[in-house]
Each structure stands twice: as structure tokens, then as C-alpha cells.
């Protein structure tokens, strides 16, 4: 838990420091805070059900059509119960994920964009960490409202933990 808090604090410091220097020279940086819903896919769906969470993201505009992003979040997926017949039910534990990702956004139009991110996910209960990638498509519904749909996968030696995610965010 201390590593997670330290990682989020470092990211927030870097984004804030970058934002302060960027605004003074006229370039744009945006922040967003969002709520996320995740639907497990692949092997992950056999042990987990729907997940909920939140995320923070900073975006530095390198041009009118492209941006560099840095994000951190928290998602919690509840564990499923599976009936083993005569042995009774087995309840899988919940899975909590803290993704820390860097990426690039390409705007196809004023409202529609593609977003690719890579980084690390940290898991609860001594689950360690894993390389993570997350391609997404999104739409700016208004100047401050952002919706995106993503596929996020964390690859570990024991397999892949993946989900389809929907993010609704307020941009400021």
C-alpha cells in the first residue's frame, strides 16, 4: 500500500510541476478525473465480476492533434462464487488494480480520439505488478465531458488479467 501511495504522489508531483512550467510558456495541459466501470474478459471473467473505480489523468498537448498522457487509477473487481457440487461453493477473492500508465492521444477530429497507453499495474494482496497496455477510443461530448472505451490487459507469468472499460470523466 505504501508503494501505491508513493507512486501516485510522485505522478501527481510530476504532472503538477510540468503543468506549472507549461502554462507559463503558453502550451496546453489538461487534467481529468473520471469514474470507470470494467467488465472482465478472457480467463479473468471466470473468477471476477464487474469492477468499479476512478482515475486521474494529465494530458500535455504536443500539437493540436496529439497529446502525451500520464494517468493513475484504482479499480476493484468483486470475486465470483462458483458451486463445486458436493464440495460446496468457492468464493474467489476480489481483485484490486492500481494502473499507472503513460500514453499518447491522437485526435481524429475535434471530438473523436484514439488513445494508447502502457505502464504497470499493481495488484492487491501481494499480487505483485504486471506490464499493462490499454488501447482506447474516446469522444469529447463537450468541452469538459469525456467518454472513452478501452481494452486493458495486464500480463503476468500466470496469464493475463484483462477487461473492457468505460470511463466517464470531467476535464479541467
Where do the language-model regions lie?
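Flexible, solvent-exposed loop segments that connect beta-strands
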Residues: 39-47, 76-96, 124-128, 157-159
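Repeated loop/turn-to-beta-strand initiation elements of outer-membrane beta-barrel proteins
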Residues: 65-68, 111-114, 141-149
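Mid-chain, well-packed structural core segment of small domains
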Residues: 107-127
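Detector for outer-membrane/organellar transmembrane beta-barrel domains
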Residues: 34, 59-79, 89, 95-103, ...
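Residues on the lipid-exposed face of transmembrane beta-strands in outer-membrane beta-barrel proteins
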Residues: 35-39, 54-60, 74, 100-106, ...
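Short glycine/proline- and aromatic-enriched beta-strand/turn motifs that initiate or cap beta-hairpins
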Residues: 20-65, 111, 161-172
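Predominantly the C-terminal beta-signal and adjacent terminal strand-loop region
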Residues: 24-26, 42, 74, 80-81, ...
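Cleavable N-terminal export/targeting peptides
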Residues: 1-28
Amino acid at each position: 500500500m505504501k508503494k501505491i501511495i508513493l507512486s501516485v504522489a510522485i505522478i501527481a508531483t510530476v504532472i503538477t510541476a510540468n503543468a506549472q512550467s507549461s502554462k507559463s510558456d503558453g502550451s496546453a495541459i489538461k487534467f481529468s478525473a473520471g469514474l470507470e466501470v470494467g467488465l472482465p474478459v478472457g480467463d479473468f471473467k471466470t473468477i471476477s465480476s464487474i469492477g468499479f473505480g476512478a482515475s486521474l489523468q494529465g494530458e500535455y498537448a504536443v500539437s493540436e492533434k496529439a497529446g502525451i498522457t500520464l494517468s493513475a487509477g484504482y479499480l476493484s473487481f468483486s470475486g465470483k462464487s462458483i458451486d463445486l457440487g458436493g464440495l460446496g461453493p468457492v468464493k474467489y477473492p476480489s481483485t484490486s488494480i492500481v494502473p499507472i500508465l503513460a500514453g499518447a492521444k491522437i485526435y481524429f477530429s475535434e471530438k473523436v480520439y484514439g488513445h494508447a497507453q502502457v505502464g504497470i499495474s499493481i495488484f492487491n494482496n501481494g499480487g505483485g505488478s504486471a506490464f499493462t497496455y490499454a488501447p482506447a477510443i474516446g469522444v469529447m461530448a463537450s468541452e469538459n465531458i469525456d467518454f472513452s472505451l478501452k481494452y486493458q490487459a495486464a500480463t503476468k507469468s500466470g496469464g493475463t488479467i484483462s477487461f473492457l472499460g468505460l470511463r466517464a470523466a470531467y476535464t479541467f
